[in-house]
């Protein structure tokens, strides 16, 4: 009985709570992004819009990242409850045997690059109006495919580098994402995500300045009508960008700095795990924003009392946003 009480007292309940939060936020992100992607694919007048298909590609990256937190949080919770969190393993074990590592490394890279591409898409939409209106689904599929191809190759490079690392048991079975890679790959991984996110935010600042200038100087015309329509989705995504900056980029940079300083500080306590929870909370906020706006856009095309009204309204909606 005494041994059992000692075993129970050794459980790190702070880490148990943190990993439950990981699972909760990760599960919320997965569920929310499935709803967003499903809504866009379900309604034809939504999936015919280039910018919304691009958003669905962005949400896929967040979904992968959230799934990594869901699986990884469950795995670590099991380890802490069974006193296995400090079992030594090699980085290669983390890369090859832990499912969550795949999502931890692939999801953030794909999500950050998609944020950058969405920013570039919005920049083209408000700057090169005529050119953007002529782009078709090939452009969107190509952009999303290029992002996920690059992210997959990038993950593959990390996988190969980890294979050639010494098989010494230098990490523990918790297998935090960057522990599975070489130091140089960890630097590249952090730099890629940070650069893509910050560049996307800078692009959005430029886009909002262009929109403000156009609003002040524009006059009634077909081009102005297109500008007004593009402004709606741009303002929606700008809310997501603001949320990303406050609750993703700043915590991400802080977490990266803590990782670099942990060699000197020794232990970051609860700060680092709570930053990860905050980062995932950003994805929850983004899900709420997108679902709120998609609900407004999906409603009109569904409620109709005319036999063919839905199809006619849908075609008008599509033609309106293709102009």
Locations of the language-model features?
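Seven-transmembrane-like multi-pass membrane architecture, highlighting hydrophobic TM helices
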Residues: 1-323
């Amino acid at each position: 009985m005494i041994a059992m009480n000692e075993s129970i007292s050794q459980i790190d309940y702070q880490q148990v709570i943190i990993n439950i939060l990981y699972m909760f936020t990760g599960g919320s992100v997965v569920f929310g992004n499935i709803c967003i992607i499903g809504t866009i694919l379900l309604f034809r007048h939504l999936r015919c819009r280039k910018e919304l298909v691009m958003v669905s590609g962005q949400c896929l990256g967040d979904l992968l990242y959230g799934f990594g937190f869901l699986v990884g949080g469950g795995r670590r919770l099991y380890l802490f409850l069974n006193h296995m969190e400090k079992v030594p393993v090699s980085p290669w074990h983390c890369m090859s045997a832990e499912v969550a590592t795949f999502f931890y490394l692939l999801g953030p890279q794909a999500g950050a690059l998609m944020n950058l591409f969405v920013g570039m898409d919005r920049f083209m939409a408000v700057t090169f109006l005529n050119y953007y209106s002529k782009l078709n689904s090939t452009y969107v599929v190509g952009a999303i495919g290029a992002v996920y191809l690059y992210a997959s190759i990038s993950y593959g490079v990390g996988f190969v580098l980890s294979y050639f690392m010494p098989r010494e048991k230098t990490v523990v079975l918790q297998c935090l994402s960057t522990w599975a890679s070489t130091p140089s790959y960890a630097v590249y991984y952090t730099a890629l995500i940070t650069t893509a996110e910050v560049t996307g935010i800078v692009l959005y600042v430029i886009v909002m300045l262009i929109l403000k200038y156009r609003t002040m100087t524009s006059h009634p015309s077909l081009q102005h009508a297109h500008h007004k329509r593009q402004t709606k989705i741009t303002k929606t995504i700008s809310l997501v960008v603001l949320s990303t900056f406050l609750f993703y980029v700043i915590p991400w940079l802080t977490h990266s700095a803590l990782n670099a300083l942990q060699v000197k500080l020794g232990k970051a306590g609860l700060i680092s795990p709570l930053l990860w929870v905050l980062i995932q909370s950003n994805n929850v906020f983004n899900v709420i924003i997108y679902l709120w706006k998609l609900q407004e856009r999906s409603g009109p095309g569904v409620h109709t009392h005319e036999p063919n009204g839905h199809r006619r309204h849908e075609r008008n909606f599509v033609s309106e946003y293709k102009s």
